[in-house]
């Protein structure tokens, strides 16, 4: 693995440990070069309560690797999380910088009604 990836994974592990101590439901984000994925995971980490990604049929047709697609994923995951009864989450950025697509997804999820 590259040093950049190892560093990102170390940051993610530290953040997840803190979220586990707080027993918080978390909104976990992963981004690849072409897609972005978001999951709302239960406090004990055993169950996915809601999820959305640019691979969903509703979002697959348009561009999938840009800020606009991330905003749509954020709105969709917020809508699905509220339907599952979740309104308060901890934002798990998986070690990625809070910038660009990750920030756009987080802002859209907040606008959709999730509290971080």
Curated annotation (Swiss-Prot):
Extent of the signal sequence: none
Entries under InterPro entries matching the protein: Ribosomal_uL18_bac-type, Ribosomal_uL18_bac/euk
Top-level lineage group: Bacteria
Entry's Gene Ontology cellular component terms: cytosolic large ribosomal subunit
Pfam families in the cross-refs: Ribosomal_L18p (PF00861)
A Gene Ontology BP annotation from the UniProt entry: translation
Keywords noted in UniProt: Ribonucleoprotein, Ribosomal protein, RNA-binding, rRNA-binding
GO molecular function annotations of the record: 5S rRNA binding; structural constituent of ribosome
Coiled-coil blocks: none
PANTHER family: 39S RIBOSOMAL PROTEIN L18, MITOCHONDRIAL, LARGE RIBOSOMAL SUBUNIT PROTEIN UL18M
Similarity comment: family membership: Belongs to the universal ribosomal protein uL18 family.
HAMAP family, sorted: Ribosomal_uL18_B
Biological role: This is one of the proteins that bind and probably mediate the attachment of the 5S RNA into the large ribosomal subunit, where it forms part of the central protuberance.
Subunit structure, as described in the record: Part of the 50S ribosomal subunit; part of the 5S rRNA/L5/L18/L25 subcomplex. Contacts the 5S and 23S rRNAs.
Protein name from the UniProt record: Large ribosomal subunit protein uL18
Species, as recorded: Ectopseudomonas mendocina (strain ymp) (Pseudomonas mendocina)
